[in-house]
Amino acid sequence: SLAHIILSLDAGARNYLKLFSSDIDRTHGHVKEIFVNNPLTELGRQDIITQMEGIDQAVISLLVRIRMDKGISTIDSTHSLLLSEMKKLNIPIIIFSFGSPYLPSYNTVETYVCTYNYGSITMQAAADVLWGRSDVNGSLPVNLNSKYLRGFGILKKKRNNGWGQRLQINFPDAWGVLDSAIENKIFPGAQVFIA
C-alpha cells in the first residue's frame, strides 16, 4: 500500500497540494494520507513511523514557500529528523519538493523531484512524473550542495507499457455488455475511454 505524507509549516499546504494529492488517490487508490503542518515532537515522529506499518512505499510532499522577511528556506528541522527515521524503514520513498528545493541534508533522500512551484500546472506535471505519464527531463537551476550542482538532472522516458511489457487489453465481455444494453434500449449509446 501507499502512504502520502505532506510536510509543511504553511497553513495552506493541504489546499495548495490538493490537485497532486487527488491524483495520487485517484490513480493508486487506498492511499494513507498523513498531513503534518507543525513541528513534530519525538512522540509525533514515532506516531508517523508506527503508521508506516504495512506501507510498501511512500510519497512525501514538501512545501516551503519562501516569503519576504520570513527567514525560512528549508523544511523544519523536526521534519528532517522524520525523513532520517523513515529512511531506516527500508521502503521506497520519493520526495517531491514544491517551492524551495533546499534541505538540511540530502543523505536521507533516495529520489528527489524539485518543482519550485505549487500551481495547478506544476501539480499535474508532478503527478505525471510520479506515475510515468510524461518524460522527466529537468535539471537543477541552482546548487543544492557539493554533489547536486546546477545542471544536474536525471532523464527518464515516460512509461508506455505496464510492468515491463506492452499492454494487451482485450475487452470482449465488456463489448458484449455494451452491445446488449444498446440493443435492449437500456441506454442509447456508449463511449469507451481507455487511458
Task: List the model feature ranges, each with a label.
Residues 1-166:
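C-terminal non-catalytic regions of proteins with extracellular/luminal or membrane-system context
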Residues 171-179:
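Short amphipathic alpha-helical segments
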Residues 179-195:
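A short, well-structured edge-of-sheet supersecondary motif
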